């Protein structure tokens, strides 16, 4: 355990950020699962709507530093390919 006040504060801040990031990461994963579930059922409109929501969450996560921008782009690309496969 830290003895110096600034180190104690940093430990507190790190824990708060860890919990916040955990929540945001969970939100991101849930939004992606909604898209995959809609694709699995074959509902194109619902999949499209879920995809739009997932893109927002992924972009927000990338901008906040929860995930890397390339990882967000990769997820969006793969989800979009699955949604497009329903259309044609």
Curated annotation (Swiss-Prot):
Cellular component aspect of the GO annotation: cytosol; small ribosomal subunit
Cited function: Binds directly to 16S ribosomal RNA.
Entry keywords, A to Z: Ribonucleoprotein, Ribosomal protein, RNA-binding, rRNA-binding
Q: Which domain of life is it from?
A: Bacteria
InterPro entries in the record: Ribosomal_bS20, Ribosomal_bS20_sf
- Where are the annotated segments for Disordered? 1-32
- Asked if the record carries the keyword Repressor, the reply is no
* NCBIfam families (alphabetical): S20
What name does this protein carry? Small ribosomal subunit protein bS20
Q: State the Gene Ontology BP annotations.
A: translation
**What family does the entry list?**
Belongs to the bacterial ribosomal protein bS20 family.
Q: Name one GO molecular function term.
A: small ribosomal subunit rRNA binding
Specify residue ranges for compositional bias: Basic and acidic residues.
12-30
One Pfam family cited in the UniProt record for this chain: Ribosomal_S20p
């Amino acid at each position: 355990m830290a003895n110096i006040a600034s180190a104690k504060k940093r430990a507190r801040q790190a824990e708060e950020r860890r919990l916040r990031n955990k929540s945001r990461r969970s939100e991101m994963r849930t939004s992606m699962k909604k898209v995959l579930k809609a694709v699995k059922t074959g509902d194109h409109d619902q999949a499209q709507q879920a995809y739009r929501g997932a893109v927002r969450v992924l972009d927000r996560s990338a901008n906040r530093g929860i995930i890397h921008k390339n990882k967000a782009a990769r997820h969006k690309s793969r989800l979009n390919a699955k949604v497009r496969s329903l259309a044609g």
